[in-house]
Amino acid sequence: MEFPGLGSLGTSEPLPQFVDPALVSSTPESGVFFPSGPEGLDAAASSTAPSTATAAAAALAYYRDAEAYRHSPVFQVYPLLNCMEGIPGGSPYAGWAYGKTGLYPASTVCPTREDSPPQAVEDLDGKGSTSFLETLKTERLSPDLLTLGPALPSSLPVPNSAYGGPDFSSTFFSPTGSPLNSAAYSSPKLRGTLPLPPCEARECVNCGATATPLWRRDRTGHYLCNACGLYHKMNGQNRPLIRPKKRLIVSKRAGTQCTNCQTTTTTLWRRNASGDPVCNACGLYYKLHQVNRPLTMRKDGIQTRNRKASGKGKKKRGSSLGGTGAAEGPAGGFMVVAGGSGSGNCGEVASGLTLGPPGTAHLYQGLGPVVLSGPVSHLMPFPGPLLGSPTGSFPTGPMPPTTSTTVVAPLSS
């Protein structure tokens, strides 16, 4: 089985991008040092030569510092070896170092590494082989406890730019990774949260206002509030700072008294013929009657005009025109009242003239009368929706001599 960039995994040929052929030989001794299973560590401790331990340490350091991972800040050795575990003939290192499950996820970043060439172990006489194997056992349980290179001080940022990752060592980020309050490096999302410099303090040169919906300028360029600016634009002068006092109510003039009735409250002050102040009631009375209003008509309260039209007044006016509107006749029907304006026969009932059936007189009580002047002989009975056909006819005998006759009859709708 072959993968791009990895070569053939089914053979015993070492990976060219991860293992240096000069450090790991293809002799059977490599199988002795890299057996599969946890017991391989103890076996390697008893049968490993110092030179083999030195070569294994250099190989492990080279695994960590391979140039193939210089383009990513993530050390991908562990996931790759975990994938190679189930492949026949794959790397035996994945089997004994990590077991069935990987301890390093693919997104884990080593923050304490630096980009440096692999360092060889200085112990060449084999005295440190036991401590090195103990270190391998410790790494098997927790790989992040093994540090082959010197750790960086905490005050310096991690140089991730060597691996091709994002560079956070700029002035926008502090060494600990917290963002700084710098408006030059703020993103559009952070601009609303960062403290902004206060706006320029503006003040109206006319009234001294500091808050207005719209700032305006006068001819000289000074700031004006919206009210002062509009006033200056419309009137050509500055808006007065003191509002003019409202017009005093005439009825509450101090010291003013009616010359006629000596009242001090009125809706309107007037003057009489001599120029003295009088109240509204006395002034109107004198204007209409040319005499002073009598003191007996004086009231404590001010009488107002009732401007609402009442229906009772209209009924009284309608019933007073031309005598009575309709009268009950001898047979129970209502009659037409005829009378002369100058002969004094107003109120006489013309006998024999009935315009409606008995009991219908109440239908015409609210109707206004129609006044007709002249002789009655030309009036002819007419049918209507409420009146019906006349039951009698006009008298054929001679009519009493009248100069003018007034006939009052209800309207027919």
UniProtKB/Swiss-Prot annotation:
Biased segments, Basic residues type: 305-318
Result, substituting residue 216 to Q: In XLTT; does not affect ZFPM1 binding; reduced affinity to palindromic GATA sites; supports erythroid maturation less efficiently than wild-type GATA1
Ranges where the record places region Interaction with MED1 and CCAR1: 200-330
Placement of covalent cross-link Glycyl lysine isopeptide (Lys-Gly) (interchain with G-Cter in SUMO): 137
Compartments in which it is found: Nucleus
Record region (Disordered): 297-327
Region (Required for interaction with ZFPM1): 203-222
Keywords, sorted A to Z: Acetylation, Activator, Disease variant, DNA-binding, Hereditary hemolytic anemia, Isopeptide bond, Metal-binding, Nucleus, Phosphoprotein, Repeat, Repressor, Transcription, Transcription regulation, Ubl conjugation, Zinc, Zinc-finger
Modified residue annotations for N6-acetyllysine: 233, 245-246, 252, 308, 312, 314-315
One MF annotation (Gene Ontology) recorded for this entry: RNA polymerase II transcription regulatory region sequence-specific DNA binding
Record's comment on post-translational modification: Highly phosphorylated on serine residues. Phosphorylation on Ser-310 is enhanced on erythroid differentiation. Phosphorylation on Ser-142 promotes sumoylation on Lys-137.
Modified residues annotated as Phosphoserine in this record: 26, 72, 116, 131, 142, 178, 187, 310
Pfam families in UniProt: GATA
Chain residue ranges for the region called Interaction with CALCOCO1: 249-315
GATA-type Zn finger ranges: 204-228, 258-282
Tissues and organs where the protein is expressed, per its UniProt entry: Erythrocytes.
Transcription regulation found in the keyword field: yes
Matching Gene3D superfamilies: Erythroid Transcription Factor GATA-1, subunit A (3.30.50.10)
SUPFAM superfamilies: Glucocorticoid receptor-like (DNA-binding domain)
Any one of the GO CC terms: transcription repressor complex
Domain notes per entry: The two fingers are functionally distinct and cooperate to achieve specific, stable DNA binding. The first finger is necessary only for full specificity and stability of binding, whereas the second one is required for binding.
Disease: X-linked dyserythropoietic anemia and thrombocytopenia: Disorder characterized by erythrocytes with abnormal size and shape, and paucity of platelets in peripheral blood. The bone marrow contains abundant and abnormally small megakaryocytes.
Role of this protein: Transcriptional activator or repressor which serves as a general switch factor for erythroid development. It binds to DNA sites with the consensus sequence 5'-[AT]GATA[AG]-3' within regulatory regions of globin genes and of other genes expressed in erythroid cells. Activates the transcription of genes involved in erythroid differentiation of K562 erythroleukemia cells, including HBB, HBG1/2, ALAS2 and HMBS.
Subunit structure: May form homodimers or heterodimers with other isoforms. Interacts (via the N-terminal zinc finger) with ZFPM1. Interacts with GFI1B. Interacts with PIAS4; the interaction enhances sumoylation and represses the transactivational activity in a sumoylation-independent manner. Interacts with LMCD1. Interacts with BRD3. Interacts with CREBBP; the interaction stimulates acetylation and transcriptional activity in vivo. Interacts with EP300. Interacts with MED1, CCAR1 and CALCOCO1. Interacts with CEBPE.
Protein name according to UniProt: Erythroid transcription factor
Source organism of the structure: Homo sapiens
